[in-house]
């Protein structure tokens, strides 16, 4: 293997307030905070693999872009569908709830206004909207997502 071999690409999302976004990504999406260094926050799963990076760039120190954002939706695929139900059992705020072949999925909006879809399905086409939110059973041993991947950036 050569030194120039790329093993994995980790997406970086610029945010205005890292602490506010850290709470959202950890509490709502079940990610694990791996490393805080300077303006960057590395997020991952229980395998301690870096999957997403938040970079703080306060609007007072950088030019704020006017108009539509380039990030329409961030699609995250979870290895275990039951972990999504464990997140929903916490009573988190979600915009849309879906049901698929493996289990539930949801869309939530970050403090920056980014739409994030968390699912465990092979194909997004099989997700159907759920009208009434069912009562989810709290899992006492749930500490966060065991494994996830950023599947798509739209």
Predicted regions span which residues?
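Catalytic cores of nucleotide-enabled group-transfer and carboxylate-activating enzymes in metabolic
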Residues: 11, 21-22, 136-140
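Conserved short beta-strand elements that form part of the metal-binding/catalytic scaffold
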Residues: 32-68, 115-122
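Conserved active-site tyrosine of GNAT-family acetyltransferases
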Residues: 21-26, 113
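Hydrophobic, proline/glycine-rich low-complexity stretches
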Residues: 1-8, 12-15, 31, 42
């Amino acid at each position: 293997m050569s030194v120039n071999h790329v093993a994995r690409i980790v997406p970086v999302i610029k945010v205005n307030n890292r602490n506010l976004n850290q709470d959202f990504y950890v509490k709502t999406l079940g990610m694990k905070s791996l490393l805080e260094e300077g303006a960057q926050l590395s997020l991952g799963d229980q395998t301690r693999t870096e999957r997403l990076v938040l970079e703080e760039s306060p609007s007072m120190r950088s030019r704020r872009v006017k108009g539509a954002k380039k990030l329409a939706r961030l699609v995250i695929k979870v290895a275990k569908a039951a972990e999504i139900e464990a997140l929903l059992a916490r009573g988190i705020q979600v915009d849309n709830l879906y049901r698929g072949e493996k289990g539930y999925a949801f869309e939530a909006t970050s403090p920056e206004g980014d739409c994030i879809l968390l699912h465990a399905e092979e194909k997004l086409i099989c997700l159907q909207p759920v009208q009434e939110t069912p009562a989810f059973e709290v899992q006492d041993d749930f500490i966060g997502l065991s494994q996830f991947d950023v599947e798509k950036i739209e």
